[in-house]
Amino acid sequence: KSKIGVINFDPMPKMFFNKSLKNFKLSSTNQKINLLKNLSVDFIITKKFDKIFSKTKSINFIKNILSQKLDSRFIFVSNNFRFGNKREGDVKFLIKNEVKYNYKVIKPKPLFIKKKIVSSSLIRSFLEKGILNKANKFLNRNWSIEGIVQKGRQVGKKIGFPTCNIDIKDYVLAKPGVYAVRVLRKNNFKTLKGIANLGYRPTFNQRKILLEVHLFNFTGNLYNKH
């Protein structure tokens, strides 16, 4: 029986080459893995994308990884897929080597919703404009992020309104504002309801965007928790 697998690069090549690119990821590696598992993918390979791997020639990627290591028979890629050192490989190059390495390239047709192609760039645009209902529709799920609770100034706690400060790292973010949220803790399937503020703290001269979440009817210490 053939198995379906997905290759994921971490960090994303685009972020690796452009260090100034922040708030770009739609999902973490862990989220991608969980989403793919729900789609009955048999195996997921998360390949570390570093300086050495970035210099891999496109033909060597086909030969050593797609052919020898994975024994690929069908390779699914989008029309704009590029790979290999300096993005030298493309879909045409993959097709050119089909016979030699005994695989078949398949280009899935674009998915349309209301005459718009579903794409990560469009979803990012919806989020940045605060159009969450459309972002969720194109994601086919509710937009979510995950992170570690960090210790903040504890100002909220002192005034009876404690908040969890979430490390948002490189996620693409929704438009700054106040949102109703549902929270899941790692290894705990009970959903907690709360309210979140995504934005800056001008009164504290805070220039970095923050995600602060206040949980309803909850007491406990969540510092350093996921």
Where are these regions (language model features)?
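Core alpha/beta nucleotide-donor-binding catalytic domains of modification enzymes
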Residues: S2-Q68
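A structural signal for isolated positions on well-ordered beta-strands in alpha/beta enzyme cores
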Residues: K3-G5, F43, F74, K104-I106, ...
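Conserved beta-strand termini and adjacent loop/short-helix elements that scaffold enzyme active sites
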Residues: I7-F9, K47, P108-P110, G152, ...
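Generic domain-boundary/flexible-linker signal
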Residues: M15-F17, K55, K86, R207, ...
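Classical nucleotidyltransferase
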Residues: K55-T163
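Phosphate/ribose-recognition catalytic cores of enzymes acting on nucleotide-derived substrates
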Residues: K151-H226
